[in-house]
Amino acid sequence: MLSIQQPLLVFSDLDGTLLDSHSYDWQPAAPWLSRLREANVPVILCSSKTSAEMLYLQKMLGLQGLPLIAENGAVIQLAEQWQDIDGFPRIISGISHGEISQVLNTLREKEHFKFTTFDDVDDATIAEWTGLSRSQAALTQLHEASVTLIWRDSDERMAQFTTRLHELGLQFMQGARFWHVLDASAGKDQAANWIIATYQQLSGKRPTTLGLGDGPNDAPLLEVMDYAVIVKGLNREGVHLHDEDPARVWRTQREGPEGWREGLDHFFSAH
């Protein structure tokens, strides 16, 4: 029985899930965000975005002070009250942004792969790509443990590129709009498990978990959740989980924040 009163954590992707993919609107989800906040249920944002972007969005959504997962799990922003935890305020796993950038530049120069990273362009270009304001676009460039890029080569070359990255201890991950390179050991699932374990250690009881996402890069997160909402998305590959028991997994009919609301309506009324 899923109840808003029980110890509960909600993990949510942003673009295409809690935020509309085009307008970044989140208002359809606002009533549920208010209910969860009033019930002291943490909503933990989990995204490919930088921690700087996510802290801005966290404040806008009324979720400030809570932990969050940035850069597809390579960065964990700790909760404000977790100041005694080693690494406060952020835990960064694996290879740094600067080191990844060096690897990518070498691969591009020596093996002639075609791609454009966010480091190659200015904030005005990123604003044009994303529809963000220039000030928000500037926050997208503050990577700490990953690189975001647009792939401009063939599928065959992408397979070769992915293999080369794996050989170098890196992974190539598809997001809602862009591709991301990060340490092979990092992931939304590992970051979520760390946060769950921290809440369990602090409270003495493992919280029930509900995750929401819309893209292939959300699958690892949703796999480790007790309950999962797969929000109808734009990505042609979709999201496929090993365990799609309908008692555990709900696929929405609506997209973005409308689907986010639909998913919460389903689990809190159906259980």
UniProtKB/Swiss-Prot annotation:
Catalytic activity: 2-O-(alpha-D-mannosyl)-3-phosphoglycerate + H2O = (2R)-2-O-(alpha-D-mannosyl)-glycerate + phosphate
Cofactor: Mg(2+)
Compartment(s) where it occurs, according to its Swiss-Prot or TrEMBL record: Cytoplasm
A GO term, aspect molecular function: mannosyl-3-phosphoglycerate phosphatase activity
A biological-process GO annotation: mannosylglycerate biosynthetic process
GO cellular component: cytosol
List of catalytic residues: 13
Known EC number: 3.1.3.70
Stored InterPro entries: HAD-like_sf, HAD-SF-IIB-MPGP, HAD-SF_hydro_IIB, HAD_sf, MPG_Pase
Gene3D superfamilies with a match to the protein in the record: HAD superfamily/HAD-like (3.40.50.1000), Putative mannosyl-3-phosphoglycerate phosphatase, domain 2 (3.30.980.20)
Superkingdom of this protein's organism: Bacteria
Positions that bind Mg(2+): 13, 15, 214
Top-level class of the enzyme under EC nomenclature: hydrolase
Alphabetical keyword list: Cytoplasm, Hydrolase, Magnesium, Metal-binding
Homology family: Belongs to the HAD-like hydrolase superfamily. MPGP family.
Protein name (Swiss-Prot/TrEMBL): Mannosyl-3-phosphoglycerate phosphatase
